[in-house]
Each structure stands twice: as C-alpha cells, then as structure tokens.
Swiss-Prot record:
Pfam families reported in the protein's UniProt record: C2 (PF00168), EF-hand_like (PF09279), PH_12 (PF16457), PI-PLC-X (PF00388), PI-PLC-Y (PF00387)
Residues involved in substrate binding: K442, K444, S628, R655
Upper classification of the organism: Eukaryota, Metazoa, Chordata, Craniata, Vertebrata
Species per Swiss-Prot/TrEMBL record: Mus musculus
Domain of life: Eukaryota
Protein name according to UniProt: 1-phosphatidylinositol 4,5-bisphosphate phosphodiesterase eta-1
Gene Ontology process terms (BP): intracellular signal transduction; lipid catabolic process
Disordered: annotated segments: 534-588, 992-1083, 1296-1321, 1581-1603
Binding-site positions, Ca(2+) 4: D814, H815, D816
InterPro entries recorded: C2_dom, C2_domain_sf, EF-hand-dom_pair, EF_Hand_1_Ca_BS, EF_hand_dom, PH-like_dom_sf, PH_domain, PI-PLC_fam
Gene name of this polypeptide: Plch1
Start-end of Basic and acidic residues biased regions: 992-1018, 1581-1590
Residue span(s) of domain EF-hand: 142-177, 178-214, 226-246
Sequence ranges of Low complexity compositional bias: 1019-1033
EC class of the enzyme, as a word: hydrolase
Sample GO molecular function, one term: phosphatidylinositol-4,5-bisphosphate phospholipase C activity
C-alpha cells in the first residue's frame, strides 16, 4: 500500500478529471480464460463505491466494490495475459484489477494507453482514500452508500422516484412487517413536495429515518435524560461512566461527541445530544463491541517467540482446492497484509533450472520461486514490522536448492541477517520485538555432527513436506506416444467431479470418509483406465516428468483415527512397479527412513526454526526446533499428552497443518491445538468459513499484527485443558449478555427466493469458544416476521475459566420450520469485549447489527482461597495427588477399557457409559420459542471415539462425562441422594481439592488407605455390584439421613465393608467405626452424624450386594468410602468433577457473601442477586442438566461437584485448625441438608460463626452455587457459650430448616476436645451453613419467600428450574426405580429393625416417636419428600433422619449440648415453605406425570389426594397437634417442632417474626413449550383428582407442609404408577397394614411386582379414603413443568 501514498496527494483537478471519465464510462475488452475478449462498457457509479459494467446477463453480479479491490497492476502481469500471444495486445493498454477473498482478477484492455492510465490512477486514488479513512468515516460512508443503493434498487422503473407500491416491495425486502396502513401514513408524512404520491431520494431518507427510529435507544436516552428528549453534556458523561464503563470521561470529550454526531444545528448550539445524534453515536465505532484500543498492538512483545500464537497459512500460494486450483504469487501479498506471519512455500524442481512453487503430485499450476520471494519481500512488512516465518518445504535437487538459497539471500538481503538479534537468556528464542523487520527461514538443517566444511548432507524427509499421502499422489507415467496433455485432460475431468462430490460433506467435518473413499476410488479408476489405454512397454525406465501411477496403500483406519503416511522407500521404482505391494502397505518397522540431500547454503539460512520430523513430542534440548504435525497426529498427541505437549510448547514452536485429505482446502478446528499451546496452526486462508472466522477473530486483537500472547498459565507451569476446572486457583469471568434488539438483518444469503423470500424469523445464538469446559452456546427466542428491528430483550449468562483464549461468537439465524438458515455472524475475542451498551455489526454486512448490553464480572470459584490464603496450598497439593487415583477409580466404572486404564491421562475423553445411555431420558428438542440449554461445543475434529471430560455430545449439549447417571428414585430427596450417594469417596474427596478435609491429620491414614484399597481387586468386584445396587443404594440413601457429602471412610466402611456387620448390629458398627482412634477422622464422625448415619443406613441397603465382599473391605474403610458411594456417588463425583466445567457460576465475591450473611433480615439487598447470581445458578444447573437424566439430582450433584464439596474444603480450613482432627465430626456432610441442598437456607443464615469460618471459603463457596433444587443443610449452631447473636442467627437458620434433622444440635457428635469450637461448629449446622453458602448462592431470598408462595418465571438459562416457595421439594423426574431398589429397601428396613433390636439409642429418637414403630421408615420416608409434585416438605425427612441420626449417636459419647444453641423461634420463613423444584427436563411423550405438577399453596396445604393420605398420617397429625412428648432438651423440642407433622404450628412460629414484605420473590423455572393438549389433559386430570381428594380429606388435618400427590385410582396391582418409575412410600408412625399407601411400580417393570414382602408400607389399596375435613381448603395452583 506504500505506492498508494502517492495518489493521496494528487491535485484535485486531476482527481476530478479521472472521476468524470470513469463515471461516464469507457469501452474496454474484458479477457476471460479460454474465451475471446468481450467488449463491455465499464463505469464508476455515482457514489464512487463500485465499478460496474454492462451489458451483463447478471446485472446484480456485474460490479466490484472499491472496498474489495486488493490491487491494480499495469501491463500484462496476470496469468490470463501470459496465456495470450506476445503481440496480441499493447502492454501499456493492459491492466488487471485483483479483488475479493480469492484474489479473482479482472483483466482489461483499453483502446489507448491514456485511458488505461486514467483508470489506474483513479482506482488507486479511491483505494488510497479508503485505506486512509478512519473507522467512523468509513461507517458513515458505508451507511450513506447503503441508503443510496437501497433507493436505487427499490426504484424499479428507474424514474428516480419511489411510489407506494415500490415502497411496499422495499419493506418486504428489508424484512419489515408493518401494516400497510402504517406504511402509507409514514409515506404521506415524508412526501412533502408538490409531486404527491412519490418520494424523491431526500424524502426517502426522511421516510427511512421514521421507519428506523430506535425505540430501544430512545428509552435509554430518556432514562439518562430525566425524561427529556436529549442528553446534556453532564448527562452524557454520566451515561458514559455508568453504563459504558469509560474512565477519564471529560466534558470536552462529551462536547466532541455532540459536535461529531448531533444532526440538529440547534442542539449543537445548546450543547445537547438529541435522539438522532445519540443513535449515530451508539452506532458508531465508539460503541462497537470490539475494544478500539485493541486495533493497536497492546500486548508485551518482548517475550520469546514460543510464548505467542502466530497467524499461519497453509499452502499459501493456492487460490482454491488442493488438486486443481491456480497458484498465485498475489496470495502471498494478500495473506501478509491480512496479518498472517507464517507462509508456506512448496519448492520443486522446475524447467530451466528454475525452482517452482506448486502443490506436488497434483494438477495445481506452477509459479516461479523467484516471483514468490519478491512478492514476500515487497509485502511482508507493509502492515506491521513483526517477523515473518518462511516455511520452506524443499523437494528440490541440490542444484536447485542452491538456486533457492541464492534467491533468498539476493532478494531478502539484510532481512535474513539475524546476527544482531538479541536472544536474551541463553537457550531461549528471541522475541518478536527483537526480530522486527526480519524474515526467518523454517526448513531442514544439516545435523551438527557434520563438519562445517561439508557442502551437503542427508536429512530426514518425513515431515509435512510430503503432505499428500501416497494414496492421493498422481505419479503420472506417460510414454509411448501418450502426451501429458491427454493424461492431464482425462485426470482433470475426473478430479473435477471428485471435488464436486467432496462438496457434499460439511466443510468443517473433521473426518471425511466420503472424500477418502472418493479419492481412492478415483485413483483406482484412473489407474485402471491408464493401464488399458497406455501401453507401458518401458516400465523399467525411470519416468521423466509427471507420471500417473497412483500408489494405493491400504489405508488402515485405526480406532484412534491415526493415519500414518505410507512413504515409499528409497528405491521408489519398486513401489511404482508394484503398486499395492511395498508402495502402499503400512509396514512401519520394515521400511527404511526416508532421507533427502540438503545443501549447506540452504541449511545455513535456518537459524531459529529448524523443521523436525515428529511422530511424537521429542524434546532433545536444542532451542529452535519446530515440530510439524498433521492435524490427525496432533489430535492424538493433544488427547493423550496434552500437559506434556503444553510443556514442550513453552520452549519450542509447533506447527500443525491440515490433513492431506482436505482436498477441497477445508479447514480443521484450530482450538484444540491453541488450547495445548501450539503456536503455528496453519489454515487454508483461501477458504472462507467458520474456522477462518475464528482465526481472524483471534488475531484481530493486538493490532492484527499476527502475534497474540499466550496466557501466562500456558507459558509457565501446566494444566490439563480438558479438566472440568483447569485453573482452580484463578478467578473466572462471568459474561452477562443481554441481547436487546437487531437492526436491518437481511434475508439469508442463500435464500432460494432472494429478496422476494419470506420475512425472516430471526434469533440470536451466542457461542463461547475456548477451553472445552468453556465451550457452550445459548440462544434467544425467535421473533416472528421481523428482520428490520426485532426485539429479544433476553439475558444469556456464561462462565469462562480462561478468558484470555476464549472467543465469543454471535450468530443470527432465520428460524425455519425445517431447520434454520444462517444470516450472519461476528466473532470477537473475549478480552476485546467492551462492557456497556454495544452494537455487534455482523461481518460482511453493511448495516446489519445486534444491540446488546455486556456485563463482565470476576467470580471466584471454590479454589480462589488458594490465592488469598496460602495455607490452602497444602490442601491443594494433597488433594491434587489423589487426582489420578480418582481417575483410575472412575475408570473402574467405565465400560470402555481403554479409558478405564488410563489413569494418567485424566483428560482422556470418555464416552458415555452404557448406564448413561440407558438411564438418560428422552429429551425433546427445544421448540421454536424455547431457549436451548447451553450447548457444548466440541470442535475437536477427530474426536469421535473418545471425547474429553469436557466433551460434549455430538448434538452439542454440554456433556459432563457423568458416570452413568445414578438413578435417584423420585421418592428420595435429592439431598439424600446427594449426600448419600454423593458422599465422595475418600480419595475423591481427596482429589477434590475441595475435599480438603482429607488434610485433617486424622484423615491422612484413611486417605492413604483409600488409595491403596482403591486398587484392591475386591474393589472392582464391589463396584460391579455397586453398579447394580447403586440404584438401590440411592433409594436407600433417600431414606438415610442426609448423608455426609464426604463419604466417611468409616461411614463407608460402615456402609460397605461393614454392611455385613451392620446388619446384625449397627450400634456395634458405629462403635467399631469410631472407637479406634486411628480411624477417627472427621469422616468417621460422620458415622455418628446424621449424615453419617444416613450413610451407614445405606450400608444396610447395600449389605446384600456387598456381603460377600465385606471381609475384604473390613480393613479398608477408606476404600469403602470411595466404593460405598457406590457407583452413584462415583458417578456423582464424576459429575462433580466434570460438571464444574460448563456451568455458569454466579459472580459472587466474598464480600457479597459476607454481606448477605451478615444481615439476614435485610434480604432485599440480595434482590439483585436474583437477577444475576441466582439465575446464573439456576442456569448452571440447567446447563448440564438438560442432557443429563434431567434429574435434579444430576443438577445438584453437578453443583455439588462443582463445589467439589466446598463445604468440605471449608471445613478443612477450620478443622485443620482444630487440635484433634479426629474429633471434628465432619459435618461437611451436612452439606447434605443445607449445604448441599439448598444452601439458600444456609445462605440466609449468616452468623458470626460463619464469619469465623474462613471468609475465604465463603467466597469460594459462593461461586459454586447450588441450583434451587436442594435445600441446604442445617445451619450452624454455635455452642451455648457463643455470642448470643450467633445463637439467634443460628436459630433462625434452624427455624428455616424445619425439615432438617440435622438442625438439631443434639444430633451432632461432639468433639472430644471441649475447646474446639470450630470443629464443632463445622460439625454443627453452622458448618453446613458455610458450606451451604457455597453451593447455595442460589438465592438467599428464595428461602425466605415461603409465605408468599409465589411463582416467578426466570429468564435466562434457568429454564428448567422452578422455585416455588411453599415447601421443599426435590426430585429427579428421570430417576427410575428398579425392582432391585425395592428389594433392597426392604432389606434395609429389615436391617434397621435389627439395629433397633440391637440397641439403637431409643431415647434419641424424635420425641414424636413418629418413626419408632417404623424400622423401614427411612426407606420410605423420603419418598414423599421427593415428590416435588406433591410438594412434600422436608419435615418427614427430617424426622426420619433425626431419628436415624441419633440412632448411631449413643455410640459416641455426646458432649452436653454445649454447641447447640437453645432453639428459639426463627425470624425467617420456614424452610419447609421453601419449594425448590429441580430442573426438569424436556420430556418425551410418555414422561409427563403428575409429579410434573408443582403445587403452590397459599397457606397450609391439605392433601390433594386421598391415595397418598393414610390413616397413619391423619392420626399422627392429630396426635402431633394435641400431644407432644417431653423433649429431651430445648433443642430437641425445637427439632420436634420442625419435623413434626404439625407444620401449621411450626410454620406459624417460624414465620411469625418474618415480615412478609421482606421476602424476595422466588424464582421459577421457565416452562418449556410442549403440546398444549397434553398440558390441558394433565391439568384436568390433576384437577379431578384434587376435587375427589378434597371431599374425602375435608376433615383431615395433615401437617401443613406435606402435600400428598393424588393419583388416579388404579387396579390393585398397579398402585401409584409413575412414568418416572419412582414409587411413593410414606414414613408413617403407625404401621397399619391397610392404612399405608402402596408403592408405585417402576415404569416398565416386568410384572406387577408383589412387593409386599417385608415392606410395611406395601398395600394393594391404592386409594385410601380420608375422612372429610372441616377445615377450609387453601387454593391450589399447579405449575406444569414440562
């Protein structure tokens, strides 16, 4: 462009003369390939923006935009001119215009040299003006041009006026859907001249402004102008500071804006900005989404080359496909000016001793090497000075190699001189800054062992030099009269058809077998044809020139998709004569290494970039090696050795090039290689498409200089890019993107009917591209029939772990009943996004844009405390050491043997296990208006059989490689399942760095054991069993107390290893677990804790399966802890591990948490959270859920996992302080109730206790919000001596958690040491509180809002979560209950009974004795709870839990309730009232059940259905109201209130002090769109059941919080059938055979399943009559979650 400078300074007279000649038009001859010249009239349009010609059959295409002209050359320089005979044309009358992405040439011949000179001068002047204008001027110019062009195109009759009919047609073209009356009204307002009925251009501009008034911008202006129609200077400054987040805003700057953008002179005088000026400003580059500062180089350019991504081109000389296209030197000029810094030159021997450049063994055209070097020399540093790497692929003889070296030195001269370059530290590559203006030659270098005097030597030739594999080579043997022309013409026809067929496949398809098959078939056909037609008599002679004998190797497809090249040996003749024998076979071992001769002159030009052949990562310690990998080989390396690869890339350069099978020049996905730190990822710049758009976006930042600094984490240290939380210690970024509106979105470019097509129905999709864990996408709803100014007003939220390498891609689609059509896109690096109100202009479209509001928050995940609290690093280290073991452990459950064994490759991508597939519910695709859940975007090209942990399904849904998703019976509360099933295996906990509990001293032994046992053969067997029993387990877990989130080794041991023992005597078990001091880790305490107890109970359930293995496990409790989790827990943990990946965490900082926690009553302050944090939380859940079984459990688990048991971590930090680690009962488990479940509750309760716990943890916790699906654990209970306020707060929390058995301090085992508050606290609910906070961040407000029981719709991704306020419900609709579970639960009942007989501590049972008579209570109690639809409250659960929790306690002496606060009425809404439906999946037709009807009741709830109300319940509720047992202590009394059926009382008491107005409204899941008829049908059935139930249940006073779901009367056998396969069992105090409700049969059960055996809840009567109730019925609302 340097030569254009001259034209900027032309005299105005000369410029005008040129312009007038060009606009009036000139007759010229247009040369085309293969035809005679065509005479055409060429002219410049009146706006001087297009060169046009006529006549033309396609007038629309007969134009070239001045903007698209790349260069204009004089004389006969183009290839087409070269094909013409010398004397045909006068060179001074010839010139060529190069334009477009593919450098198409327009070759013109004028009648005289003067005309040619005029056109060349005029065109270069226009190009100079364009290159010189700033972005604002360009935007204004293009806008004006667009309006003028629009007017001209609408003027069909060419009279310069538009009538009303032409306006209507224009409206349709512009995708405006306005009533004709409205259009006519605007038309009349704009038509002001005497010529009524038509609009001139000026009138059309007025009309267009009316039509395009931006309502969204107008409202924005009003909001900052105090309802005026203009902004003053001060108001504008305020807007820029507050909304646009601009710093250093001065009044002068604001005045400049007014002067520059305001249209009205009157406003300029007043120094105010009106709506037109404001619109102009908002549409200007100043408010573009891309940071204007990044148009310049802003990064540190003094680091070694290996610390940068470098823009690289593959086969730069080609203009099209790899087989037939033209090679052009201009392509080098083009890509260098686009910012590419590494170009490729394939050198081959040419005629006359002149090396040529082309793609070997193909029919691409040849260009001279000398011309290429001259072009590179001329254009290398036009746009920037940073170094250019010349990748020489040398296939030449020694003589021509010397010629190459000669040209390089002679033409490039001092650009090759690197002697002055400062390399800085020894053995380090120089920096881009120190190499400015230099050209590096990348090529082979002679080995060092050769003396300096050696003129030549041999080097390996096995690298990308010979990219085309033998199967694709054309070695054309022609002889005996067959001419080259004959052969080429035949082949060309075949290849053209081949290329056409190859277009069938998606260009981005990484692994096109279609093309491979076509290639082979074509080659074989060609070979056969030539054999028939060519009498090859002299087969022994060497062929001269090109020969066509294709070498067809058997291309073996490895499972890993690795393809090794089939190189021929040194004696190539043999392979040519025996095609299919040596030439083609892959005989790696037997073949000789291919070598080539290299001359010293060329070798000496290679300094820092020595090409090394590589089948693997080889670091020989020398600086300056560049490894070259084909994309397929690189893919394997990235998958198998990502961390090793990253370390290599910290010292050396790596180049990745496209597979030889990409004959159509398609591009692979560069992301996986960038993520592994590869610097030179070479793409085909001539091929437009998604991958080049991503590449362009990546390098556009930093001034488009071709060098982008890698993140520091990639330059030092290492991390696993496939991990679910690759950088645990680093804060993440949260992107909150509000998509407001669109402007002038055109019809799809490939629209069949063009402008006459239908008005589009646009929607916006936003995709995050980066690390696998960050890759996801979300979309807005569809706006029908409006492409001109659609309004979406939707917020999308994303969490990004490594923002430095992430890109944000905005896509606009036209929704179509049978798919969607691409309208436009824009891709921007995350780091270049600017916050505030921004326009995103779509690439390549003049006016089309979308208007968004961007907020970027920094959020701290569970690991951020590492930064703030160095003591965490030890925990981190200890946890990390278990990471690999855990991977191995997970592998045991993975049916894919290859992955299971790869413990060290933790990042290996896993396929979903069979269990996953079986348990996965059918999920319908989102309907048109419905938001899709975040979709995972795994672009890894070759990943087909193995997908990384962050891997996603092909369908795009973010897939956290969850182990087979555990089925939680719907009848089991999620938290139970979570807690029980979730308890991490010890090692897992260990692995979870969060499970820092491991760090407790007492725990270390266990951890060691865990590791050892993990490898125990028993374990694998055990796991197998577990897999079968896991469902049962889960089931049982449902009944267990909230099991600890950390599986207690003991617990587990108790559960698993000891299952046998426990069976006879749980008490003993507990003792065993707890007595030996050396095993007494906090986890063991769990055994006593409610949570622990739950685990142990689970044990009972498992005993049958595990019995035979019990002996093996007795000593290996820790192991058990892992195993006990059972597959479910493992899976859970998997979920956890991988889950954290894609979810959008809320941005919640420590301060936020403390603030929230510190002031409980004032929840309004947290209201803001609802919109963002909470919805994000919800989104988080939704995000992974959508493709998991759809169960809330999965979501919760995910959340849990995300937090990786932050609770545990938290605990650790405190526990670690305690003297006796063993003593700290790991209440982390408490995560079970609140912490895990709803930390919301815990959230609410902040107490100093909490604050005492490390605040850091809180922060971290905060980010791992748990979706609203679960209620948190009990809140912390300080010891009596603690600050009263603490107590109060604690109580508050407890009050809120009526359902949590754990709320009762009495249940917490005491630490041996009296003074260890913290341990105790941790044990106590307080601990959970904090823990809870982490998972909870969901929405403090939510928990409070019980009284209002309002349903709110949540925007954003939370579509699947519904939060109802009234009562706590959790469910996993997708959970199926298998007969096995039923059986096991019965067994559990039996165990419990035995345990009771063997001395369970009765005095600890709940005062209400609700469960005294029901050994199996736990088994069934939870069922109610789980039925979200029924709205079961936690109370049942808590009671059963409480009892069970206490059952184990006697074994461990309980300190007096010193840590337990005295219960007092809570000031908060009862948690019981908190209804947290879990995210529900999109259900397939048979899946919708009554459980999908969420009930919201205003006040006490009565039973909806008699079928779920039993006499036991009635009696119990009556007795509970009339009589209460004497509490053992105040806390127990409080607990009794919380868990008793007397919900009415407890609700009143708890809520009495809570101001209704203080309760923020709860969030509710958005309903997905489903068939209306189904919805109506379900609603009507529910209503009928409700009516029927009302009459019978009139007199019944059931506890207020329990809503029993009604079921239609059914035959005796099919009691309470649910499509989810869950069964409902009640935990009733009285075991009246007839009065108990029956369990439903699992969906698809083979038989009716007489499950009465040992099942005290079993009853064949599905419909239980209830007596009429005199009490008033509350109004019932049903929320159909579809």
């Amino acid at each position: 462009m340097a030569d254009l400078e001259v034209y900027k300074n032309l005299s105005p007279e000369k410029v005008e003369r040129c312009m007038s000649v060009m606009q009036s038009g000139t007759q010229m001859i247009k040369l085309k390939r293969g035809t005679k010249g065509l005479v055409r009239l060429f002219y410049l349009d009146e706006h001087r923006t297009r060169l046009r010609w006529r006549p033309s059959r396609k007038s629309e295409k007969a134009k070239i935009l001045i903007d698209s002209i790349y260069k204009v050359t004089e004389g006969r320089q183009s290839e087409i001119f070269h094909r013409q005979a010398e004397g045909n044309f006068d060179p001074s009358c010839c010139f060529t215009i190069y334009h477009g992405n593919h450098m198409e040439s327009l070759d013109l011949i004028t009648s005289n040299p003067e005309e040619a000179r005029t056109w060349i001068t005029g065109l270069k002047y226009l190009m100079a003006g364009i290159s010189d204008e700033d972005s604002l001027a360009k935007r204004q110019r293009t806008h004006d041009q667009w309006v003028k062009q629009t007017f001209e195109e609408a003027d069909k009759n060419g009279d310069g006026l538009l009538n009303i009919e032409e306006i209507h047609q224009l409206m349709h073209k512009l995708n405006v859907n306005l009533p004709r009356r409205k259009v006519r009204q605007m038309f009349q307002e704009a038509d002001t001249d005497e010529n009524q009925g038509t609009l001139t251009f000026e009138e059309f501009c007025v009309f267009y402004k009316m039509m395009s008034l931006r309502r969204d911008l107008y409202l924005l202006l009003l909001s900052y102008s105090d309802k005026k129609d203009h902004l003053t200077v001060e108001e504008l400054a305020q807007f820029l500071k507050v909304e646009q987040k601009m710093s250093n805003v001065t009044l002068d700057y604001c005045l400049d804006i007014i002067m520059k953008f305001e249209v009205s002179e009157e406003n300029k005088v007043k120094n105010v900005l009106g709506i037109e000026g404001f619109t102009n400003f908002m549409r200007s580059p100043a408010c573009d989404v891309f940071n204007p500062l990044h148009h310049e180089v802003y990064q540190d350019m003094d680091q070694p080359l290996c610390n940068y991504y470098i823009a690289s081109s593959h086969n730069t000389y080609l203009t099209g496909d790899q087989l037939l296209s033209q090679s052009k030197v201009d392509m080098y000029a083009r890509v260098l000016q686009e910012g590419c810094r590494c170009v490729e030159v394939d050198c081959w021997d040419g005629p006359d001793g002149e090396p040529v450049v082309h793609h070997g063994y193909t029919l691409t055209s040849k260009i001279l090497f000398r011309d290429v070097v001259e072009t590179i020399n001329k254009h290398a540093f036009v746009k920037n000075e940073f170094p250019v790497i010349l990748s020489i692929e040398n296939h030449c003889s020694i003589q021509q190699q010397r010629k190459i070296a000669q040209y390089l030195k002679g033409i490039l001269q001092d650009k090759l001189d690197l002697s002055s370059v400062d390399t800085g530290e020894c053995r380090q590559l120089p920096s881009p800054q120190s190499l400015k203006g230099k050209i590096l030659v990348k090529g082979k270098k002679l080995p060092y062992h050769l003396g300096d005097d050696a003129e030549e030597g041999e080097v390996s030739d096995e690298d990308s030099a010979d990219e085309i594999e033998d199967e694709c080579k054309f070695k054309l043997h022609y002889s005996n009269g067959t001419t080259e022309h004959q052969v080429e013409s035949f082949i060309r026809k075949k290849l053209e058809s081949l290329l056409k067929e190859s277009q069938i496949r998606d260009k981005e398809d990484p692994d096109s077998f279609t093309v491979r098959a076509l290639l082979k078939a074509t080659h074989e056909g060609l070979n056969a044809h030539l054999k028939q037609n060519l009498d090859v008599k002299e087969s022994g002679k060497k062929s001269h020139g090109r020969s066509l004998m294709a070498n067809f190797g058997k291309h073996k497809q490895k499972a890993t998709k690795s393809r090794s090249k089939s190189y021929s040996t040194d004696d190539e003749d043999d392979s040519l004569q025996n095609p299919g024998k040596e030439g083609g076979q892959l005989y790696r071992l037997g073949r000789r290494r291919r070598t080539m001769k290299l001359c010293r002159e060329l070798s000496d030009l290679v300094v820092y970039t020595n090409s090394v052949a590589a089948q693997d990562i080889v670091d020989d310690g020398t600086t300056g090696n560049v490894l070259s990998f084909s994309e397929t080989r690189a893919h394997q390396v990235v998958q198998q050795k990502s961390e090793q690869f990253m370390i290599y890339n910290q010292k050396q350069l790596t180049r990745i090039y496209p597979s030889a099978y990409r004959i159509d020049s398609s591009n692979f996905n560069p992301l996986p290689y960038w993520n592994a730190g590869c610097q030179l990822v070479a793409l085909n710049y001539q091929s437009e498409g998604r991958m080049m758009q991503i590449n362009r976006a990546k390098f556009k930042a930093n001034g488009n200089c071709g060098y982008i600094l890698k993140p520091q984490q990639m330059c030092k240290g290492t991390f696993n890019p496939f991990s679910g939380d690759p950088l645990p210690a680093n804060p993440k970024k949260q992107l909150i993107l509000k998509v407001i509106s669109g402007q002038q979105l055109p019809k799809p470019p490939d629209s069949m009917f063009g402008d006459r097509g239908e008005i589009i129905d646009p929607f916006v999709e936003v995709e995050i591209i980066g690390l696998p864990v960050d890759c996801c996408k979300d979309q807005t709803r569809v706006v029908d029939d409006n492409g001109f100014n659609p309004v979406w007003e939707e917020t999308l939220t994303f969490t990004v772990h490594m923002p430095e390498i992430a890109l944000v891609r905005f896509l606009v689609w036209d929704h179509d009943p049978i798919g969607r059509d691409f309208v436009g896109q824009r891709t921007v690096t995350f780091s270049s996004l600017v916050p505030g109100y921004r326009h995103v202009y779509l690439e390549g479209l003049t006016e089309a844009s979308i208007f968004v509001h961007i907020t970027i928050n920094e959020i701290f995940g569970k690991w951020s405390p590492l930064i703030l609290n160095p003591s965490y690093t030890i925990l981190h280290f200890l946890g990390a050491t278990k990471n690999r073991q855990l991977q191995g452990l997970k592998g045991l459950f993975n049916k894919n043997p290859r992955h299971a064994s790869s413990e060290n490759n933790s990042h290996y991508v896993r396929k979903r296990s069979i269990g996953d597939r079986i348990l996965r519910r059918t999920a319908s695709a989102p309907a048109k208006g419905r938001k899709k859940s975040k979709v995972g975007f795994q672009e890894m090209v070759e990943i087909k059989d193995s997908v990384s942990e962050a891997s996603r399904d092909q369908d795009g849904v973010l897939r956290r490689t969850t182990r087979s998703l555990q089925v939680r019976p719907v009848s089991m509360p999620v938290d139970k399942s979570l807690l029980g099933a979730l308890s991490l295996p010890i090692s897992e906990a260990a692995k979870d760095t969060d499970g820092k509990e491991n760090c407790l001293a007492g725990d270390k032994d266990d951890r060691r054991k865990g590791a050892a046992t993990r490898k125990d053969p028993h374990f694998s067997n055990f796991n197998k069993k577990l897999s079968s029993s896991s469902s049962a387990l889960l089931h049982k877990d449902a009944n267990q107390g909230p099991t600890a989130s950390v599986s207690n080794p003991e617990q587990c041991g108790g559960r698993g290893a000891k299952s046998e023992r426990i069976k006879p005597n749980m008490t003993n078990d507990c003792q065993e677990n707890h007595n030996p001091p050396k095993f007494l880790s906090p986890r063991k305490h769990l055994a006593l804790d409610p949570a622990t107890k739950g685990l142990q109970e689970r044990l009972h359930g498992m005993k049958t399966n595990e019995k035979e293995h019990a002996e093996g496990f007795l000593g290996e409790k820790s192991m058990l802890s892992g195993s006990v989790l059972s597959q479910s827990s493992l899976e859970v943990e998997n979920l956890e591990g991988s889950r954290a990946k894609g979810r959008a965490a809320t941005s919640f900082s420590l301060s936020d948490v403390s603030a929230l926690c510190s002031d409980i009553p004032d929840l309004h302050s947290t209201a803001i959270l609802q919109d963002t944090e909470i919805s994000n939380l919800i989104d988080d859940v939704t995000l992974t859920n959508e493709n998991q079984s759809g169960s809330s459990i999965s979501a919760l688990i995910g959340q849990f996992e995300e937090s990786n048991h932050p609770a545990n971590v938290t605990v650790v930090s405190h526990l670690s302080t305690s003297g006796a680690s063993g003593s700290a009962p790991f209440q982390t488990p408490f995560k079970h109730g609140l912490s895990q479940g709803n930390q919301k509750a815990s959230f609410l309760c902040s107490s100093p206790e909490l604050n005492k716990l490390s605040s850091v943890e809180t922060t971290k916790l905060a980010n791992n919000a748990v979706p609203c699906g679960v209620i948190g654990s009990p809140i912390s209970t300080p010891k009596p001596g603690d600050d009263p306020s603490d107590k109060a707060k604690t109580r508050v929390i407890e009050g809120n958690l009526p359902g949590f058995p754990d709320a009762s301090p009495g249940q917490f085992p005491k630490s041996p040491t009296h003074g260890e508050d913290h341990s105790q606290v941790m044990n106590s609910p307080a601990l959970s509180t904090e823990l809870a906070i982490e998972d909870i961040i969901a929405d403090p407000a939510l928990s409070i809002n019980s009284a209002e029981s309002s349903l709110v719709e949540i925007d954003g991704e939370s579509e699947n979560l519904s939060l109802t306020t009234c009562d706590y419900r959790e469910e996993a609709p997708s959970q199926l209950v298998s007969p096995l579970k039923l059986q096991q639960s019965q067994e559990m009942v039996e165990h419990i009974q035995r345990g009771l007989r063997n001395g369970y501590c009765k005095e600890t049972l709940l005062p209400s004795e609700i469960f005294n008579n029901i050994p199996g209570v736990k088994n069934h109690s939870i069922s109610h709870l789980t039925y979200q639809g029924a709205g079961f409250v936690y109370n049942h659960f808590s009671s059963s839990d409480a009892k069970t929790n206490q059952i184990c306690e006697p074994q461990q002496p309980r300190a007096p309730d010193m840590h337990a606060p005295t219960p007092t009425p809570s000031t908060h809404a009862p948690l019981a009232a908190l209804k947290l439906p879990s995210p529900c999946k999109s259900k397939s037709l048979g899946d919708l059940t009554s459980e999908d009807i969420a009930c919201n009741f205003e006040s006490k709830y009565q039973c909806i259905s008699r079928s779920f109300v039993t006499n036991g319940i009635r009696d119990k509720s009556v007795t509970m109201k009339t009589k209460s047992l004497e509490p053992l202590d105040a806390l127990t009394e409080q607990l009794r209130k919380l868990v008793s059926f007397d919900q009415e009382d407890s609700c009143q008491v708890l809520y009495s002090k809570q101001d209704v107005n203080q309760c923020p409204r709860a969030l509710v899941r958005k309903l997905s769109s489903r068939s209306q008829s189904r919805v109506r049908n379900i609603a009507s059935r529910a209503k009928e059941k409700q009516e029927a139930g009302k009459q019978k249940a009139m007199a019944q006073s059931t506890r207020g919080g329990v809503v029993l779901r009604s079921k239609p009367p059914a035959p005796a056998l099919a009691v309470n059938r649910h499509s989810t396969g869950s069964y409902i069992a009640s935990y009733l105090r009285n075991m009246k055979a007839g009065g108990l409700e029956g369990r439903g049969i699992p969906e698809g059960a083979c038989t009716a399943l007489r499950y009465g055996y040992m099942d005290q809840f079993c009853s064949d009567n599905s419909v239980l009559q209830t007596e009429p109730s005199s009490e008033d019925k509350p109004e019932i609302y049903f929320l159909l979650r579809l």
